[in-house]
């Protein structure tokens, strides 16, 4: 098999796995567990009956996440804030009232909902808004994270922060390997050296950290600092023949601002 076709097959498999029922998302591999919920008061934990995703509160009634997180045949049934782990009784829980998927991602969304293979990756458009049935109470400690400016697209070499509830096969604690634990990490922006759709932001593990998003982190934010703004949303991972590690593609929020602003 040629390198070109091997690349197409690998990308297709990654995308299909991330949108299927049992593996809907991407982990902060080798990440550091967050010790206090107030460190990321804007982070949301999205769950269906079988899967989980990460999101960011961008208005008092809207959570920004990945399109593939809401395109599963299983709907999101709960959105939790100020929670460090799955099942945390101290968190604040909300019910979703609806979702808005970016138009550019709808071909992949329809395929996922109908359980059909994804024809092509649309990671640059992989953005959705989950609307909440009730406004969050900002007096509770939950915070809204700011959106970027249209020019806020980080250049290659930029150090960034990543946050999410994903699984971590590198965690020495067996109870934390399957995800549902909020972790943070560092990574680096790189030039996308492969064919993409929607002009995503490509991210590689930081040279001294080895941390990347993984299943469960999908929809999680790409941050220039721990306070924001949210520059990107985790879409999916890609393996390239010349690189030893996975490259993670993020949908650029700056490039999707019109959609986001009109739906929050």
UniProtKB/Swiss-Prot annotation:
Swiss-Prot/TrEMBL keywords: Disulfide bond, Hydrolase, Protease, Serine protease, Signal, Zymogen
GO biological process, one term: proteolysis
Activity regulation annotation text: Activated by an autocatalytic mechanism.
GO MF entries: serine-type endopeptidase activity
Signal sequence range: 1-19
KW Transmembrane helix (keyword) present: no
Expression across tissues: Acetabular (penetration) glands.
Disulfide bond annotation, renumbered to this chain: 53-69, 192-202
InterPro entries xrefs: Peptidase_S1_PA (IPR009003), Peptidase_S1_PA_chymotrypsin (IPR043504), Peptidase_S1A (IPR001314), Ser/Thr_Proteases_Immune/Dev (IPR051487), Trypsin_dom (IPR001254), TRYPSIN_HIS (IPR018114)
PANTHER family documented for this protein: TRYPTASE-RELATED
Job of this protein: This protease cleaves elastin and thus facilitates penetration of schistosome parasite larvae through elastin-rich tissue of the host.
Name the UniProt record assigns to this protein: Cercarial protease
Organism the protein comes from: Schistosoma mansoni
